[in-house]
């Protein structure tokens, strides 16, 4: 057993077996087992209660996973048969280009379990797991492909305001922040155990994002997390130590949202002072202030390089910025019901009007052609950057109440980028641009998750 299980795992298994033998009223067998495995640890009522039912749960989990694997194998076999019998011409006709896919009603899944409004959602970068946070103080982990609840994560004492997956390569973590003034880190590989709590903010922590690798000049790539708070500050944390390594001040009021650039060099924040601000993540110095909204700015996002060509055309530029550069364009959404697109120097490029209530979430389409927004008017709107930002699609009644959050499933990453590469499969030198564009399209996952005051999380997928 020692060759398969660690000492800790073996001890946990022994406790679960002893608890199970107690449940089925087999004290002699339990005593014999304890003697056989030389189990001398105390086993009081609290320990017994903790481990009762664990063995049965593990067993049913294995059966459930076996069933899921079987279903996936059958589905894969069916799809492969269909693919083998389909000609390339008809395949192109039947399958929509993922770079042009937009969400449509009805949702594939409506996920129900939260008891209070949903405030945030986040996709696991690899697995089909989705985290949702709520004012009910819990985080729910879902399988978004199957539409099933996997577990409920508890630990915060007030509403959960944001969640995000990220962290060091090969060691994905889930981060959450709350009105209880704390940030918590959870380990998905260990049943979402709370591995660290980060105190330090003096008011509600509104938003968190893992900072992509290589940020802030840190040699420990992927270890940084940025948070935004009602205490008017941004804080940068090292998740390996739990220490705050930088506090960024400049906003005059509640900071509602924060978004890092793809390379981690820049941080974009905004909030109740009706401004958005771009910061150098390494020095904490302000690069630019975006002025123009007439109400609180609820959400911000930095445009990915794949959208540069379309945004440069929208801005009237002769040629787009190099794909290796970051924070060239940004978008902001406000309670004034508008979305504004800016260049990285603070020049307003376009104002998108159409929502009838607060704009609560923004995401750039991974294909680079669209900007999507979610609003308290219950809709999702899709804006075409190649058509002067015209609204080309509205998902009406996406929810029955205010849509509070929206995230796009991250692209499937097949190969690590080489030096000079930007995300979404594009290269700085353009040597293999066509090949990279095809690879980027193939990696797009046409899946969006939204959360709402109506207590529902919805999955929109192709």
Swiss-Prot record:
Region described as Disordered: spans on this chain: 78-103, 414-434
A biological-process GO annotation: establishment of mitotic spindle orientation
GO cellular component: cytoplasmic microtubule; kinetochore; microtubule associated complex; nuclear envelope; spindle pole
InterPro entries in the record: Dynein_regulator_LIS1, G-protein_beta_WD-40_rep, LIS1_N, LisH, PAC1-like_LisH-like_dom, WD40/YVTN_repeat-like_dom_sf, WD40_repeat_CS, WD40_repeat_dom_sf
Coiled coil: 60-87
Record carries keyword Glycoprotein: no
The protein's role, per its UniProt record: Positively regulates the activity of the minus-end directed microtubule motor protein dynein. May enhance dynein-mediated microtubule sliding by targeting dynein to the microtubule plus end. Required for nuclear migration during vegetative growth as well as development. Required for retrograde early endosome (EE) transport from the hyphal tip. Required for localization of dynein to the mitotic spindle poles. Recruits additional proteins to the dynein complex at SPBs.
Protein name per the record: Nuclear distribution protein PAC1
